[in-house]
Amino acid sequence: MRKSIIGIIVLHVVMALDQISKLYMSKLYAAHGDITVFEYCNLIQLWNKGISFGLFSTLENGNTVFMVLSAVIIAILSYTKIKTKSMSRSCCLSVIVGGALGNLMDRLRFGAVYDFIDLHIGDWHWPAFNLADLTITCGVIVFLAMELRKRSQLNA
């Protein structure tokens, strides 16, 4: 029970922080336009109709496809989270699901995901992203690292 409550709290905190950051950045952008944080980082406004890196942004009915796909992935991860006995795995999955729900909320409300972090070196730009993308990526990396560690311990 404790694992479930903590997981739900983590999920909601991640989702809320994502939505708050997007609201704050949209207001900041409306007042100031693009903002240079430091030489390699700008805060911008980009509406991503595709998936990661803007892939498939021109896909016909893409938003509907991505919403359904997101919902299926969220359901699978939520089921996995419920079944896991590990608090750390549950928290990782909650971070991933919270980020995915944050981006899904954007798709439902705006028809696209709001990205605002632009990292670049000279003219080369990493695709813009947001806090939800960051939490999903970190959650996946930590989850995979835990799984690899678990498997190496089982094989030792």
From Swiss-Prot:
Membrane topology: Multi-pass membrane protein
Cellular compartments annotated: Cell inner membrane
Pfam families: Peptidase_A8 (PF01252)
Spans through the membrane: 62-82, 126-146
GO cellular component: plasma membrane
Reactions mediated catalytically: Release of signal peptides from bacterial membrane prolipoproteins. Hydrolyzes -Xaa-Yaa-Zaa-|-(S,diacylglyceryl)Cys-, in which Xaa is hydrophobic (preferably Leu), and Yaa (Ala or Ser) and Zaa (Gly or Ala) have small, neutral side chains
Gene Ontology terms, MF aspect: aspartic-type endopeptidase activity
InterPro entries, A to Z: Peptidase_A8
GO BP term, pick one: proteolysis
Pathway: Protein modification; lipoprotein biosynthesis (signal peptide cleavage)
EC number: 3.4.23.36
Keyword Transmembrane recorded: yes
Residues the record marks as active site: 115, 133
Assigned keywords, A-Z: Aspartyl protease, Cell inner membrane, Cell membrane, Hydrolase, Membrane, Protease, Transmembrane, Transmembrane helix
Principal subcellular localisation of the protein: membrane
Coiled-coil features, chain-numbered ranges: none
Its job: This protein specifically catalyzes the removal of signal peptides from prolipoproteins.
NCBIfam families cross-referenced by the UniProt entry: lspA, PRK14775.1
Stated family: Belongs to the peptidase A8 family.
Protein's name in the database: Lipoprotein signal peptidase
Biological source species: Anaplasma phagocytophilum (strain HZ)
Underlying gene: lspA
